[in-house]
């Protein structure tokens, strides 16, 4: 039976892709990736830099809905699952995802549905955006007994500041202005870092709350260290 590979391609730098990710992409008949077109799909273009022969494969662009509406999501996930089932009739399928497939990725919903239907699904982990961001900043995420909390900042984030250790705010772009304003207003005595478009050619790094920019893009990570 043909398999679905959920392939984490890392945060943006193609050199951060794993050998296993490359091998499973190469062995797959069809490559699926998020976006509206080849040109605008970040995941596809990361892979294309190191697997130029990807253009010779069957390519399917998947438009994942950016919404919290459960009805829209249910309909979309059902359609995507059925589409992948059809593609699996032709051979193995690699579904690309930015970062790691297990961290806030639509892939996980699709994988669960396919597994329930008896289809073999293999997940290939990727380097997370926040691990890469910390490396770019030259800082540790945790030391000794410090806790690490990953927060989707597109939801409520205020309560997170009551936690201890390190906070990582993902998907900060949509709520960035609100989050940055909150951090500046509260004048927290913590170490504040921000990375926009980690690993990409337009990457930007910021250190300190006072240096946070007024606006930022969707692929923004904010790291808060030193909560006690």
Pin down the residues of each PLM region:
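Class I S-adenosyl-L-methionine
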Residues: 1-14, 19-22, 26-119, 212, ...
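Short gly/pro/ser/thr-enriched loop/turn and capping motifs at secondary-structure boundaries
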Residues: 38-40, 67, 128-131, 200-202
């Amino acid at each position: 039976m043909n398999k679905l590979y959920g392939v984490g391609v890392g945060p943006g730098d193609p050199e951060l892709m794993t050998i296993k990710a490359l091998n499973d992409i190469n062995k797959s008949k069809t490559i699926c990736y998020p976006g509206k077109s080849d040109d605008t799909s970040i995941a596809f273009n990361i892979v294309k830099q190191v697997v130029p022969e990807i253009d010779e494969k069957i390519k399917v662009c998947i438009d994942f809905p950016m919404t919290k509406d459960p009805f829209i999501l249910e309909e979309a996930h059902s359609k995507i699952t059925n589409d992948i089932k059809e593609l699996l009739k032709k051979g193995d399928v690699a579904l690309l995802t930015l970062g790691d497939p297990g961290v806030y990725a639509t892939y996980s919903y699709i994988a669960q549905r396919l597994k329930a239907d008896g289809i073999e699904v293999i997940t290939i982990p990727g380097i997370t955006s926040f691990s890469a961001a910390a490396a770019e900043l030259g800082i540790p995420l945790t030391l000794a007994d410090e806790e690490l909390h990953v927060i989707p900042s597109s939801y409520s984030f205020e309560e997170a500041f009551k936690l201890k250790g390190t906070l990582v705010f993902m998907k900060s772009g949509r709520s960035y202005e609100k989050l940055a304003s909150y951090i500046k207003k509260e004048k927290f005595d913590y170490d504040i870092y921000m990375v926009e478009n980690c690993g990409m050619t337009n990457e930007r790094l910021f250190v300190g709350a006072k240096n946070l920019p007024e606006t930022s893009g969707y692929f923004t990570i904010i790291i808060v260290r030193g909560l006690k």
